[in-house]
Amino acid sequence: MSSATLKDVQFIPNAKSGMVSGLLLMPASAKALLVLAHGAGAGMRHKFMQECAAKLAEGGIATLRYQFPYMEKRIKRPDSESMLTDTVRAAVAVAKKNAGGLPLFAGGKSMGGRMTSLAAAKEPLDGVRGLIYFGFPLHAMGKPGAERGDHLAEIKLPMLFLQGSRDGLADLKLLKPLCKKLGKAVELFVIAGGDHSFHMLKSAKRSDDQALSDAVKKTVAWIKKNSGL
């Protein structure tokens, strides 16, 4: 982390959003930049987001974390889908301006990843080479179904799903065949024993930190592969 610089950024997603903030973490030897959206209940400074960005920086991957408008305004209820996807698109544009020519990727935690996928399905995200989901929310808790993944077939990019085997928001019996159907450019990496945020049971042989490290290690390798590095 000592060799990485942290820069505050601000941008306006659309005419109704107001200003939102972001954090650009750029390691000295950055190989690529990942636009990283937060989940529904916690913003870009949440422990998961901070630790994920820090571990990615150690692997040579820069990140742009950012707030959705409702989180910036400290409102509990998420914005409309259109506002969220507009914010994703605007964040990607900001990242591209700050990337210095680095390969660009996008994704996020839970809802942030899904909104990134919806934005990409509607219209390609400028300059983005692949999408990464840290716990894709395929369905509501206790209500298994794959309808929330229908739009993924419209995305013509490599995708990486990082999913805990105990994730209550993504039954692997549904997610595995979905990923297979999407084609060879789509990869599913399962964190054995992890939940939706990769938390491990106390009886597990590895810690939450180790589980996140495994997910990040996979992410770094996948980004490098899809950057031609």
Where are these regions (language model features)?
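Serine-hydrolase catalytic machinery in alpha/beta-hydrolase-like enzymes
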Residues: 10-104, 198-208, 228
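Gly/Ala-rich beta-loop-alpha elbow adjacent to hydrolase catalytic centers
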Residues: 108-116
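Conserved alpha/beta-hydrolase "acid-adjacent" motif
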Residues: 168-174
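A conserved short beta-strand
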Residues: 126-138
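Short beta-strand/loop motif that positions the catalytic acidic residue
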Residues: 155-156, 161-163, 167
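Catalytic histidine neighborhood in serine/cysteine hydrolases
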Residues: 181-200
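Short beta-strand immediately N-terminal to the catalytic nucleophile in serine-hydrolase-like folds
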Residues: 105-108, 134
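Catalytic active-site module of serine/aspartate enzymes centered on a nucleophile-bearing elbow/loop
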Residues: 203-229
